[in-house]
């Protein structure tokens, strides 16, 4: 399609930007729906379905809970002295020893999980006047009755159970975790049969704390043939402190201590299989990539993970505003320039030129403007990831029934944090998208102004992103405009001459209407003047008589 007013003595140069047939809708601060040429999804919404064992050291709990492994349940002996970054508890885990409860289960579980080890050191406790190593048919170790391997069930010796008073100092330079307990028989007869006294008491103290527990005799629901229970407690003995155990019966004594370590180990409930693969971020659903700043797979995470948000999708604009090319314009399509629409078919570039001159038509990219825009946009995704990825884990929170109000408060706090981060994510992405679109528009305007300053009076802005050049401009001339070496003085005289010649015969449509109306008005006025003059002349000659009647 020939451009208006184009001949061998003139040329047309249009500036335009990249466009695609089907763009991507993104959100900005000023517009909820704006189309761009390209965008990147920021929300990871699916997992691999498996837990990767690298770079984190994963310990599969299989059919054991962490607490059962800690106590030494016979079917969990394989976990003795194990270490982990993440302990994975399965839904099919079960206890297979004497029924027990842990009054502060969640705290103990979290404490041991964060320590990342079940390293156990046996100590030489002296229990005089009692029978050690009690067992139960509810806790078989092989064919024989057994018990938790990390605990020592003490019962009467003969017909006596003396008051026990044992001291164990911590002379090491690390903290020690002692696990102990108290037995609650189901009947008074069982109480006296095992411990002689009608009621037992256990006191465990350090310089910093003291716990006093009294046995609670009574029948409970039968579990593995037992209606009695054991309550498990724990005490941390700091370096330089002393552990003191005093009891007159019902004591489930420690055999040693667990070495406490500080670290970023954790625990997670999941039934996802463990596989040989690499992933920094783990959720109960499986590992997920952390190349996006946000995820909505699961609130519970371990490792360097995207921030959890409620949104299913958030798109970051990585391209410019998209204005699809009008396909009805023929060969040149969007020759009108960037003000009307974009240009499709531009490969690997964002900005460019199209021209028509005596040598034909052509198109070329402006790599400098393209690179300037790309350089500023490329780092956006990494910057958003740096702002949002958590370098720590979000663990499960558990509370006992008596801590219901605390649990409600914790849930409220977590939900509020998620709401806040979801809102922050929306605003952050909208701001970045607004900046991207403003940036790419600015680069287009810079290129247009640069071209205008070069051409000066040698060309006319056609108002649609194009310039009409009023001198012969071959391909070499066009190239000089594109690369910034154009010398307008060389063509100045020719351009002025051609401009006057063309303006003499070619009027802009905006002025043509005015001139037509003015010409029509003048013609009507002259016609009226001539007609009035003829009437007056005829009246003077007597050829026309005018009678006025009242």
Swiss-Prot record:
Q: Would you tell me the protein name for this molecule?
A: Hemagglutinin
Family from the record? Belongs to the influenza viruses hemagglutinin family.
Q: Is the Lipoprotein keyword given for this protein?
A: yes
What kind of membrane protein is this, topologically?
A: Single-pass type I membrane protein
Which of the residues are on side Cytoplasmic?
Answer: 536-550
Source organism's superkingdom? Viruses
Residues of the site described as Cleavage:
329-330
List the keywords (alphabetical). Answer: Clathrin- and caveolin-independent endocytosis of virus by host, Clathrin-mediated endocytosis of virus by host, Disulfide bond, Fusion of virus membrane with host endosomal membrane, Fusion of virus membrane with host membrane, Glycoprotein, Hemagglutinin, Host cell membrane, Host membrane, Host-virus interaction, Lipoprotein, Membrane, Palmitate, Transmembrane, Transmembrane helix, Viral attachment to host cell, Viral envelope protein, Viral penetration into host cytoplasm, Virion, Virus endocytosis by host, Virus entry into host cell
A single MF term (Gene Ontology): host cell surface receptor binding
